[in-house]
């Protein structure tokens, strides 16, 4: 093999190895950042994995919000109108968080079936509902509650 052909072959191999490594790293990073959405029914039925970060969403049950008096710990119940799941969170809830509205919590399920959230997302206006929550509500035969009109 002449030197020019050998040099070209090495360059092509180096490029292919570099592209392969880049694709592998990108896939690894994407796999670690995927958070699958689970409804309260799926979580209650044991379909959601424990010790894996997931997204859990539904409607916050009225009267279920409990705040700790001496810390930022919050506990509330989320439902899809079939089954409910308890969510615990340590931190400041979003300003738009209210009972009776749709939320999505990101966290892990503990051995007791409670979602220990590290992030809670609330809808940003009364017309928005996360697509996953809307789908889960439709599957359960419910519709999203209509907000009370102000004034």
Curated annotation (Swiss-Prot):
Any one Gene Ontology cellular component term annotated for this protein: plasma membrane
SUPFAM superfamilies tied to this protein: Heme chaperone CcmE (SSF82093)
Superkingdom field: Bacteria
Periplasmic side, ranges: 30-151
Record carries keyword Coiled coil: no
Segments on the Cytoplasmic side according to the record's topology features: 1-8
GO BP annotations, alphabetical order: cytochrome complex assembly
Gene3D superfamilies named among the record's database cross-references: Nucleic acid-binding proteins (2.40.50.140)
Membrane topology qualifier: Single-pass type II membrane protein
UniProt keywords, alphabetically: Cell inner membrane, Cell membrane, Cytochrome c-type biogenesis, Heme, Iron, Membrane, Metal-binding, Signal-anchor, Transmembrane, Transmembrane helix
GO molecular function: heme binding; metal ion binding
Main location: membrane
Annotated family: Belongs to the CcmE/CycJ family.
Function according to Swiss-Prot or TrEMBL: Heme chaperone required for the biogenesis of c-type cytochromes. Transiently binds heme delivered by CcmC and transfers the heme to apo-cytochromes in a process facilitated by CcmF and CcmH.
NCBIfam families xrefs: PRK13254.1-1, PRK13254.1-3, PRK13254.1-5
Protein name: Cytochrome c-type biogenesis protein CcmE
Originating species: Pseudomonas fluorescens biotype C
